[in-house]
């Protein structure tokens, strides 16, 4: 969301401006500046954000279909014509001129029969997050202390991941704990089983925190677990693939639609992850070509299912650039109309998303 350094400029605008302004006015945000990521991390009250999103959707007059599951997609050649959806209240058909694949797992692209990729070198691990309440903010261990203790005591407490952290939300007596690793397979029984495994891991982390840091966490309890956090599972084969070399070099593409300075953050082993932060003046970009399935005329992907290699995707699947990708996808489909997103005026698209690529105020 922000450039590197302790007070980097905001990189993503549009609805991001509205979220930061309105949640900030509610006291529902906390800005963590600097630290291991060398950037500004925005902590938020998850209830306040979810209600903001729901109200934004309602006020925009968007027709919603809650709890629907995609069962199939009907095609006419390179175009998706209609989606087959199931809800507990009955089946539904959804026809549209264009579609955004923001499913995370490229479900729309996959169900339509277009090419997709999966991690080639083993799984990318997900995380079961939890929010603790009743902590003592003044007695929190440092991140380095927590990691060293977790590594030393992992066998005793049955910890899988040893390099996690607990981010305190000042003034609320709460902490966001990110200290688990679970596989997130694309198979219904396995992913369901692993969701329970993730909570079991989180409970072991809580036991570790309460036992090893009783002054800080002794009176804490779980406020919420949330759904399993899925990082990288399956993504589109795009017109262009973003590479780790592009990320490290800060390649600015002629069709760039998003930017970020977030580190390479590849969770490719159970006990830890690759963490490669960048300098204060670093910036890397997401090309529109990586949002467009190479075989499709009316799909644009957004979020963690765009086309990138494992390491590149690990750096651009975070919230700031994902918001920018969503905006770019909507504008691209608007420009395409009943035509193909493969043939839109990229210069016109760049003008529409300029704030998310060029703005520096």
Task: Give the ranges of each region predicted by the language model.
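Conserved beta-strand-loop-beta-strand element in the redox core of flavoprotein oxidoreductases
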Residues: 74-93
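Short, basic and Ser/Thr-rich N-terminal targeting/leader segments
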Residues: 66, 79, 216-218
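Short amphipathic beta-strand and strand-loop transition segments with alternating hydrophobic
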Residues: 71-75, 165-168
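Conserved N-terminal/central alpha/beta ligand/cofactor-binding core
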Residues: 1-72, 125-127
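Flavin (FAD/FMN)-binding glycine-rich loop and adjacent Rossmann-like elements that form
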Residues: 1, 14-15, 19-24, 91-98, ...
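Short beta-strand element of the conserved SAM-dependent methyltransferase core
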Residues: 73, 85, 130-134
């Amino acid at each position: 969301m922000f450039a590197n350094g302790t007070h980097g400029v905001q990189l993503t605008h549009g609805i991001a401006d509205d979220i930061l302004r309105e949640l900030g006015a509610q006291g529902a945000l906390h800005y963590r500046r600097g630290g291991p990521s060398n950037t500004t991390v925005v902590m938020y009250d998850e209830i306040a954000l979810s209600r903001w999103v729901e109200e934004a959707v309602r006020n925009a007059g968007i027709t919603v279909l809650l709890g629907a599951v995609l069962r199939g997609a009907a095609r006419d050649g390179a175009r998706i014509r209609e989606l087959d959806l199931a809800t507990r209240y009955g089946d539904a058909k959804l026809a549209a001129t264009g579609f955004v694949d923001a499913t995370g797992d490229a479900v729309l692209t996959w169900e339509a029969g277009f090419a997709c990729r999966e991690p080639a070198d083993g799984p990318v691990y997900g995380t079961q997050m939890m929010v603790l309440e009743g902590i003592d903010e003044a007695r929190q261990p440092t991140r380095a202390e927590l990691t060293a203790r977790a590594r030393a005591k992992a066998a005793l407490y049955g910890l899988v991941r040893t390099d996690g952290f607990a981010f305190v939300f000042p003034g609320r007596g709460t902490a966001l704990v990110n200290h688990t690793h679970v596989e997130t397979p694309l198979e219904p029984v396995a992913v369901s089983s692993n969701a329970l495994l993730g909570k079991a891991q989180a409970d072991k982390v809580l036991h570790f925190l309460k036992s090893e840091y009783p002054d800080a966490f002794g009176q804490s309890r779980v406020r919420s677990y949330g759904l399993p956090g899925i990082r990288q599972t399956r993504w589109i084969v795009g017109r262009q693939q973003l590479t780790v070399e592009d990320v490290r070099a800060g390649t600015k593409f002629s069709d760039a639609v998003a930017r970020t300075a977030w580190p390479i953050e590849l969770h490719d082993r159970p006990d830890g992850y690759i963490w490669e932060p960048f300098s204060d003046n670093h910036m890397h970009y997401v090309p529109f070509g990586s949002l467009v399935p190479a075989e499709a005329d009316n799909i644009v992907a957004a979020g963690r299912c765009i086309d990138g290699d494992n390491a590149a995707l690990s750096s651009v699947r975070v919230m700031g650039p994902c918001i920018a990708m969503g905006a770019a996808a909507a504008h691209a489909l608007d420009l395409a109309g009943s035509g193909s997103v493969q043939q839109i005026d990229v210069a016109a698209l760049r003008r529409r998303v300029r704030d998310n690529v060029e703005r520096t105020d």
